[in-house]
UniProtKB/Swiss-Prot annotation:
Probably involved in ribonucleotide reductase function. Belongs to the NrdI family. Pfam families: Flavodoxin_NdrI (PF07972). GO terms for biological process: protein modification process. This is Protein NrdI. It comes from Pectobacterium atrosepticum (strain SCRI 1043 / ATCC BAA-672) (Erwinia carotovora subsp. atroseptica). One of its GO terms (molecular function) is FMN binding. HAMAP family: NrdI (MF_00128). Coiled coil: none annotated. Gene3D superfamilies: 3.40.50.360.
Amino acid sequence: MNPLVYFSSQSENTHRFICRVDLPALRIPIATEQPALKVDRPYILVVPSYGGGSTKGAVPRQVIIFLNDPHNRAYLRGVIAAGNTNFGAAYCIAGDIIAQKCQVPYLYRFELLGTAEDVANVRKGVTEFWQQQTT
């Protein structure tokens, strides 16, 4: 199965969610001094939303750098976003921004660490998404 590619800050919320989903995954490094992640096959991006309710700064800088690499961007097939409902209309807005800019489907959104239902939905949805891509 093709991987999930994700970014998680030092809070580790997205990382903990990815661990619970238990599918193949690659992590975009937190520190820009670390070696850049290069993907070599199609992937779904899982991204937290930042900015406290504003669209400015909603997509983490590390994710922008990752997607600005044409090689990485070419393999992007979909996006899943994490967020905080306290952000109101900007809840999970990083997913909206990336899906629109990269012309890929926005597959799912979840709050903070996600619930057991979110984990099951993502696991099932990702599996079905890749099965549809191969038929």
